[in-house]
Amino acid sequence: MEITAVQSSYYGDMAFKTPPPDLESLLLKERIVYLGMPLFSSDEVKQQVGIDVTQLIIAQLLYLQFDDPDKPIYFYINSTGTSWYTGDAVGFETEAFAICDTLNYIKPPVHTICIGQAMGTAAMILSSGTKGYRASLPHATIVLNQNRTGAQGQATDIQIRAKEVISNKQTMLEILSLNTGQTQEKLAKDMDRTFYLTPAQAKEYGLIDRVLESPAELPKPMAVI
């Protein structure tokens, strides 16, 4: 007599119910990546949150390329990036640069879709999706700004940090200029103060390509050659 193991349903009698997989795994199965919190850099905060957000996002993107390099990836963004709502830094811009580089490195087309908000470096990540595949839901808010940092310590440490801030700002301007078609001078001027954009304004600015009302409006995958 052959005995076959059968996994019970996720729902049923409490005594026999098996725990469902975590939500991230369910989304990943459908090739969906979700950034729904800031990009923290502090190890202490990462331990409190229980996750290294940047590491998880990059690992998911790399896995999806390995899984199928031709199928599109859907990257939903609802994040304040490397800062709080106030603009105070909670992470280094290098966290966001790593995600942008990964988006450009992998082969699958990546739909970046803003839901809720994309602020600062999160807006930069939004703009780094595959051209023609960058979108926002109609009532989201997209914000361009710079992190406010308060360097502490010895004078030499403050000088080193100041150089890093200037270098990161320049890198962010270069990425945004490449993604939007705006000049670095215009971007620097607009980002001197918090710069709010509606999805329609973000489309005109070059941060996204379309405003979505439903999933049916997502662009169709490109033919594999």
Swiss-Prot record:
InterPro entries: ClpP (IPR001907), ClpP/crotonase-like_dom_sf (IPR029045), ClpP/TepA (IPR023562). GO terms for cellular component: endopeptidase Clp complex. GO terms for molecular function: ATP-dependent peptidase activity; ATPase binding; serine-type endopeptidase activity. It comes from the Bacteria. One of its GO terms (biological process) is protein quality control for misfolded or incompletely synthesized proteins. Gene3D superfamilies: 2-enoyl-CoA Hydratase, Chain A, domain 1 (3.90.226.10). Belongs to the peptidase S14 family. PANTHER family: ATP-DEPENDENT CLP PROTEASE PROTEOLYTIC SUBUNIT, ATP-DEPENDENT CLP PROTEASE PROTEOLYTIC SUBUNIT-LIKE-RELATED. Has lost the two conserved residues (Ser and His) proposed to be part of the active site. Therefore it could be inactive. This is Putative ATP-dependent Clp protease proteolytic subunit-like. The gene is clpR.
